Amino acid sequence: MPLNLEDKRAIVASVNAVAAEALSAVVADYRGLTVSQMTELRSKARETGVYLKVVRNTLAKFAVKDTEFECLNDALVGPTVLAFSKDDPGAAARLIKDFAKDHDALEVKALAVGGVTYGAQDIDVLAKLPTRDEAISQLMSVMQAPVAKFVRTLNEVPGKFVRTVAAVKDQKQSAA
């Protein structure tokens, strides 16, 4: 059933609003996936906070116009599913990569971060990015390490003194 002009405008506005706020995007070819597999992909996308949409390529090109994902226009050929990450730049890449492991029919065409397009071979780089919580945890451990070493160093001085006094005491007891 063909879409009327108002429906097309609504789709373009919806995808454009998401693209304007997104941190990264993945374009994939879903040709060969069954309806149940697409439903599974959509449910996993909802669980991970990824916006996933199958859009006609001409509408997708209008939707990403004037966003940092306009660079993906060349990849919008054939059956295309768009996946946008809002909070975690690697979420969409992880979702598509993990789903593609089990379903060979899903093929990554391109991905974009910060207005730069990357090829399908670079999905591992984006997928391996830590989540926000993991990055904060790593930062906190890096910041905490010098303080912890300093505290251990400070504790070593009285500990060494106590061990020295105990050694002198043992030496005097054995001499007596």
Swiss-Prot record:
Keywords: Ribonucleoprotein, Ribosomal protein, RNA-binding, rRNA-binding. CDD domains: Ribosomal_L10 (cd05797). Signal peptide: none annotated. Gene3D superfamilies: 3.30.70.1730, 6.10.250.2350. InterPro entries: Ribosomal_uL10, Ribosomal_uL10-like_sf, Ribosomal_uL10_bac, Ribosomal_uL10_bac_type, Ribosomal_uL10_CS_bac. GO terms for biological process: translation. GO terms for molecular function: large ribosomal subunit rRNA binding; structural constituent of ribosome. SUPFAM superfamilies: Ribosomal protein L10-like (SSF160369). The keyword RNA-binding applies. GO terms for cellular component: large ribosomal subunit. Part of the ribosomal stalk of the 50S ribosomal subunit. The N-terminus interacts with L11 and the large rRNA to form the base of the stalk. The C-terminus forms an elongated spine to which L12 dimers bind in a sequential fashion forming a multimeric L10(L12)X complex. Belongs to the universal ribosomal protein uL10 family. HAMAP family: Ribosomal_uL10. Forms part of the ribosomal stalk, playing a central role in the interaction of the ribosome with GTP-bound translation factors. This is Large ribosomal subunit protein uL10. It comes from Alcanivorax borkumensis (strain ATCC 700651 / DSM 11573 / NCIMB 13689 / SK2). The lineage of its organism: Bacteria, Pseudomonadati, Pseudomonadota, Gammaproteobacteria, Oceanospirillales.
